[in-house]
Amino acid sequence: MKVIVLGVLAVALGAWGDGIKVTLEGAVGRKMDTLCLKRAYGSEAKGRIYDEAVNAFRTHYDDTRKAGVGEAWTQGKGLWQGEYWGKTMLSSALVSEYAGDAAFKDWLRTKARAFVKEFQQPDGYLCTYKDRTFVGGPDKDGREVFCWNLWGRKYTMWALVELARVTEAPDLLEAASKMMDQEIDQLEKTGVRIENTGYFVGMPSMSVLKPLLELYRATKKPAYLDFARKIVAAWEREGNPPPNLVANAFGPKPVHEWYPQPAWWAKAYEMMSCLEGLVDFAEMEGKPRLLDAVKRIVAKLEANELNAVGSVGFFDHFTNASACPNATTEPCDVIHWMRVNRALFLATGEAHYLDSFEFAFYNAFLAGVYRDGRWGAHSVRSHGTSHRTAPHQVGMKYHQCCIDNMPRGFLDFAATAVTRGKDGVLTVNLYSAMKAKADKVGVTVTGDYPIGDEAKVQVEADAETKVRFRVPGWFDAVEVDGAAAKGPWHEATVPKGGKTFAFRFVRTPKVVDSKAKPGADPRRRAFEEAREDPGMTNLSRLTPAAKLVYGPLLLAKAKRVTKDAKAILGRDSVQGRNFTCTLEPIEADGVWGAWEATLTDGVTTIVREVCDFSSAADSEESGNLFSIWF
């Protein structure tokens, strides 16, 4: 892989699917390239980052460590170092495919084979837990035992499936199959049901559904589909034990009211991982009711869990996040909110799922990926001195759950940019700068969307071709070649040789009131995390405020565009006061887009410099003040 030493990766990374290769360019492509260099195939990534993930299988830290200072809470519990090899290699396998880098694929194949040879036991067991039978579940008093054994196995197995496909190594698929065979056999022989393992009412363990179905596609082993059916059946049990996802989907209650104390069971990342698998299962088995169940849960999340930065949940839990005057969201949640919406779009063709996907990506996701590519946020905040930088978890120096997932967020975006509908029509879904190749059709998108208001889409075709363009729901109007495009799709016939389409996105900035009510719980401890960042002390909002939305962009006041700290973190609010806003572009270094915002209700006028939320604080240093609140 060739690299020009200018801080920017020269080689293009492309996403493959349905015979389509997409290469991201522009600001999004550069940020992706930087992350993948630092976290996937650079020398540090292939050195100490990879080695630390492997070492977890030697030390068995997850279930044999001695609790050190400040770690008393871990005694007797199972931890999650076991997820990192799988997450790292899952991302790396996909990066190697998208980059088309044969040397990197060779490196991955060699490392994966050495890993399997060293750690997989003859019966297929491959895990960081020394005690394979420690899979969590209720203790003698009926309480859940904190344990991530099967969760870690899931990621290892998933990585092996993808490595086998990408590097053309059937022995790695065999290793994945042996892993799954051993897990199924162990659960059957010990009489343990998967829904009674792990923590958070079995959802981490049951989230194996998605990679299990991928393994079934690759091997056609009936046992895997049978096991998938058992998992899905466990979400519709009599007596309504939690989480009962399918049964509860059809009830009237929002997710956080399904059972008491949602902070102890309604884990966002793991539930959405299950939902993604359920979409796949519904499609595979031809079960429209199950697909409807996921659609209903997503609608419940949009109604009660959509947070102010475009993701769902409050710090990885579904606890009525929309009602809180502060917002904080894990990148893992953002990525899996994107993945669920992507899955529903591919299954249904309904464009509104792409609106949710797009807003989450441009705002909460990009904000959490630090611009140097080395690290990122554990929680993306609505405001503060910085986002909450990811801590080094469970004895690791170079891994953290959100960081290891981040390449997949970009890869999912690339794989969603251009797709084929179920009718075979090529569909342009996203308008970031990119190049795509689908059989004999080429697509090039230029412009600075969504900072700019225009994009050109050049379609090259050897023969007359129909193309479908998404009309994003974020705009007041969308024009194609000067004529209004009526959403959600604009269809056009491209003549032989090709055609260039000129898109204009018409938008006005919107002052959007918070759904939080006066007196709502600000959840200060979880939002501020002042033990890690004392500068966040007392920075929680105690009352709701409004935010500025400009098409699919969330705007923020930030130190990078203004030095007035009081203006950034001031407590005053235009919430409920019928303010409107106009924007004028301004020049500012270090941000993607910047504007002067003028807010007025006809009597009072407020002028503030703002930038795109993703640029406001996407770095590790503290004191980088920012806020979305007005």
Model-based region annotation:
Residues G29, A228, V294, L354-N363, ...:
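C-terminal beta-rich recognition modules with glycine/proline-rich loops and embedded aromatic residues
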Residues K66-W85, G136-T156, E188-M206, P241-E276, ...:
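Solvent-exposed loop and edge beta-strand segments that line ligand/cofactor-binding
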Residues T23-A27, K31, A53, D101-K117, ...:
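Extended, well-ordered alpha-helical scaffold segments
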Residues E283-N304, C324-G373:
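Catalytic-core region of carbohydrate-active enzymes that cleave or remodel glycosidic bonds
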Residues F475-V494, V511-G519:
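Solvent-exposed beta-strand/loop surfaces of large extracellular or lumenal domains
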Residues V28, T88-A102, K154-P170, S207-K221, ...:
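Well-ordered alpha-helical scaffold segments within catalytic/enzyme domains
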Residues W16-Y84, A102-G136, P170, R229:
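Low-complexity, Ser/Thr/Pro/Gly-enriched N-terminal "stalk/linker" regions
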Residues V8-G17:
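Hydrophobic h-region of N-terminal signal peptides that target proteins for export
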